[in-house]
A protein has these predicted regions:
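ABC ATPase NBD coupling module
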Residues: 1-18, 22, 41-45, 57-60, ...
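ABC-type ATPase nucleotide-binding domains, specifically the catalytic core motifs of the NBD
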Residues: 1-3, 26-43, 51-56, 147, ...
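Conserved ABC ATPase signature
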Residues: 62-66
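ABC ATPase C-loop
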Residues: 79-80
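Conserved catalytic motifs of ABC-family nucleotide-binding domains
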Residues: 83
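Catalytic Walker B motif of ABC-type/P-loop ATPase nucleotide-binding domains
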Residues: 87-91
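Helical segment within the ABC ATPase nucleotide-binding domain
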Residues: 102-114
Length: 165
């Protein structure tokens, strides 16, 4: 399936690494996310700036000059520019500071509240399960456990094996 067809189906993806156009400004990166849209994207850009105020401050700065956490916010924002039904996040907090991690999780919750489905692969299992409606524990690529985020957090075997006790 062509990428534009996936976008038209409402799917958006934020990769873990190499997730911004480093030679473009923050705003140009966001505009790239809205490239296939036929409507006016300015309202969505403003929504992204409301979600990530630091991006508005840095909108004319090259994305290549940003910190890892700020780049992650640009990538997240660019994906939101497609107005997705489902947002897929690959390790959204990898390599970011604890403060940025907490902020990203808060923003994920905000996006989820708008009705966008979130499919996330995340190294910080405890925090991810804390916001998850549904969770899956994979071992060697196979589904080992599944349940609500709360069920998995409270499962003694999951806690011992995957959550540090």
């Amino acid at each position: 399936m062509l990428p534009q067809n996936r976008i038209n189906l409402g799917l958006a993806f934020v990769p873990q690494i190499n997730n911004v156009f480093t030679g473009m400004t923050v705003e140009e990166n966001l505009e790239m996310g809205g490239f296939l849209r036929e409507d006016d994207i300015i309202h969505t850009i403003n929504d992204v700036y409301d979600l990530f105020p630091i991006l508005k401050e840095k909108k004319n700065q090259s994305a290549g000059e940003l910190s890892g956490g700020q780049r992650q916010q640009v990538a997240f924002g660019r994906a939101l520019m497609t107005k997705p039904k489902i947002l897929m996040l690959d390790e959204p907090t990898a390599g970011v500071s604890p403060i940025v991690m907490d902020e990203l999780f808060s923003r994920i919750i905000e996006v989820r509240k708008t009705g966008v489905g979130i499919l996330m692969v995340e190294q910080n299992a405890k925090q991810a399960l804390g916001i998850a409606d549904r969770g899956y524990v994979l071992v060697n690529g196979k589904n080992s456990r599944e349940g609500s985020g709360e069920e998995l957090l409270n499962n003694p075997e999951v806690r011992k094996s995957f959550l540090g006790g």
